[in-house]
């Protein structure tokens, strides 16, 4: 089984995002935050967004390993510049820069 170990910073972000119907994780990098929230049933769905395809590919692989890729959409974009961004009821921008 896939195991998520969030850093204290990401764990704090996760607490604020709990209960979201659609979370946008901007600058998702590895995708640990939305994956953890989905695995624990704390959110309904998420968009993992990153401007770089390499980290986004890593997030996609982690989601497949965790078995939650059906509830996670991947967008290679700048910030919230993806279709349907206005439908997100929670946004996390953590660890950028």
Protein language model regions, located:
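Glycine-rich SAM-binding Motif I of class I
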Residues: 31, 35
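Short SAM/SAH-binding signature in class I
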Residues: 87-94
């Amino acid at each position: 089984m896939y195991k998520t170990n969030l850093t204290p910073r990401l764990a704090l972000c996760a607490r604020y995002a709990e209960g979201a119907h659609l979370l946008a994780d901007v600058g998702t990098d590895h995708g640990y935050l939305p994956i953890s929230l989905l695995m624990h049933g704390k959110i309904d769905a998420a968009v993992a967004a990153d401007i770089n395809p390499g980290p986004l590919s890593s997030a996609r692989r982690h989601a497949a390993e965790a078995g939650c890729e059906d509830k996670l959409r991947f967008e290679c974009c700048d910030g919230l510049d993806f279709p349907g961004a206005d439908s997100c009821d929670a946004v996390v921008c953590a660890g950028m820069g």
